[in-house]
């Protein structure tokens, strides 16, 4: 694809993926402007914050490949649109996915608006996904060809207007080849590790971070039979399916099998735990999702056979759309799903096409 004469703003994070994205687009003839987003203000000098080094990496890459870069601060927008929701959800006992909201509200809204103000026709990011326009003129979001790195799950809330102005150059390229390109062109960050976890938490212990904003509220830890086997520190600090950090590893209670978080009783501040990975309380045949968002603007029809993911990196699970009633979606799975977690996203697929989804209730 030739980009001759077209201006594109590339979200550059200092990582390998966005750096190769910028280089690829320049090779295609685009006028590339790099934009570094600062979405978090606190702890810039802490051992966990890499913002300063990331910016230096962006500048080094930009100098090498010959593109202009600028930094823009979206910290206020991030706290209002993403982090506030993150805290509300955890306070309510759910486990949110802030990366999904960050994409919809910051990277493909605030960032997109800023890029348009710079005279860009399109934006680009280093996400592993694909966009195509179908015969009806609709834009479709597809999985990356490298399914092991596919990130369409995190992008399922994007709409037609956003996708129509977005390029995902890495969607057609295996991750291994991206690393090879970085080395071949001599990128200074070619061997930099991929970022993991929630962006504003970084490598710091999650429980320590959350405790800065939410108070502990100890309560009983019970089995399904009602037997008290321990004490939790606060329901917000646990997620369904959690095994590590429960505090029952050396317990004499039970049959020796591993313990898992199974349910939260918010009204009575009680955490229910079970033993065994396949305990019935951890298996869900039917789920309901709300706060729905559909890439094409329309939901799938009731009765449609689809596939769904209820967490990132999960294999597609066969399901049937039982009902779409306003802002509520009901899915029935061919096989019960493990540790379906309220607050996470249920994302629907028709083959490689990501249709959209909603928040699990």
Curated annotation (Swiss-Prot):
It is an enzyme of class 2 (transferase). GO terms for cellular component: cytoplasm. It is found in: Cytoplasm. Disulfide bonds join 102-199. Its EC number is 2.8.1.13. The active site is at residues 102, 199. This is tRNA-specific 2-thiouridylase MnmA. It comes from Cupriavidus necator (strain ATCC 17699 / DSM 428 / KCTC 22496 / NCIMB 10442 / H16 / Stanier 337) (Ralstonia eutropha). The gene is mnmA.
């Amino acid at each position: 694809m030739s980009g001759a004469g077209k201006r594109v703003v590339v979200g550059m994070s200092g990582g390998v993926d966005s750096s190769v994205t910028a280089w690829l687009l320049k090779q295609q003839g685009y006028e590339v402007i790099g934009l570094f987003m600062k979405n978090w203000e606190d702890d810039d000098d802490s051992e966990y914050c890499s913002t300063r080094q990331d910016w230096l990496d962006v500048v080094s890459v930009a100098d090498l490949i010959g593109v202009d870069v600028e930094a823009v601060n979206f910290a206020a927008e991030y706290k209002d649109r993403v982090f506030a929701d993150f805290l509300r959800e955890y306070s309510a006992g759910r486990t949110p996915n802030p990366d999904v909201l960050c994409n919809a509200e910051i990277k493909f809204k605030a960032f997109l608006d800023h890029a348009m103000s710079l005279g860009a026709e399109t934006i680009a990011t280093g996400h592993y996904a694909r966009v195509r326009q179908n015969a009806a003129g609709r834009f479709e979001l597809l999985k990356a060809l490298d399914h092991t790195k596919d990130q369409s799950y995190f992008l399922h809330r994007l709409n037609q207007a956003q996708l129509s102005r977005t390029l995902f150059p890495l969607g057609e390229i295996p991750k291994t080849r991206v690393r090879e390109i970085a080395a071949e062109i001599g990128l200074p960050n070619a061997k930099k590790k991929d970022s993991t976890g929630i962006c504003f938490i970084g490598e710091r212990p999650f429980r320590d971070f959350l405790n800065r904003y939410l108070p502990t509220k100890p309560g009983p830890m019970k089995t399904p039979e009602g037997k008290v086997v321990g004490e939790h520190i606060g329901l917000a600090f646990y997620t369904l399916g959690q095994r590590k950090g429960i505090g029952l590893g050396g317990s004499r209670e039970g049959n020796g099998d591993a313990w898992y978080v199974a349910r939260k009783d918010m009204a009575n501040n009680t955490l229910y735990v079970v033993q065994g990975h396949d305990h019935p309380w951890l298996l869900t045949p039917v789920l309901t999702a709300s706060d729905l968002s559909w890439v094409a603007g329309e939901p799938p029809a009731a009765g449609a056979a689809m596939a769904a993911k209820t967490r990132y990196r999960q294999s597609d699970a066969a399901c049937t759309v039982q009902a779409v009633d306003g802002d509520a979606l009901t899915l029935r799975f061919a096989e019960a799903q493990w540790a379906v977690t309220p607050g996470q996203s249920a994302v629907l697929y028709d083959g490689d096409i990501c249709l959209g989804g909603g928040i699990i209730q």
